[in-house]
Amino acid sequence: VWFDRVSRGMYATDASIYQMMPLGVVVPRTGADVEATIAIAREHGVPVTARGGGTSQCGQTVNHGLIVDVSRYLRDVVALDTAARTVRVQPGIVLDELNRGLKKHGLFFPVDPSTASRATIGGMTANNSS
């Protein structure tokens, strides 16, 4: 958890022109960390914004509340069922990394944004990327 000005400043913008200094930044290591962050923020009326790769060009990853950066630790493939052709992942996994792993099994995630080398699945889902 970071509340210093330099750390907050790094999260004050994304790939857009928008800039907002957040109250703080949380970098969770587990889903339980995310749950605890949201519970505490709700208790204090602080808005929460999840952030993946920060590739949004419309400002969806900036706000004046807490930024929850899922891209650092929540990047794993949780389950892969090649027979059913399904994969369950954590929100911080980068699309290109996911597809490198899936390629070994003859699979791929068929969404192709120009930012695939940096865009996370969580961010893509939040923005309805296709």
Predicted segments, located by residue:
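Conserved oxyanion/phosphate-binding beta-strand-loop segments in alpha/beta enzyme cores
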Residues: V1-A12
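Active-site beta-loop-alpha junctions enriched in small/polar residues
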Residues: V6, S114-A116
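Short glycine-biased active-site loop of nucleotidyltransferases that positions the nucleotide triphosphate
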Residues: D14-I17, Q57-V62
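N-terminal glycine-rich flavin-associated loop
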Residues: S16-V48, L66, V70-S114, T125, ...
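Conserved PLP cofactor-binding pocket of PLP-dependent enzymes
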Residues: R51
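Beta-rich nucleic-acid/ligand-interaction surfaces
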Residues: R118-G122
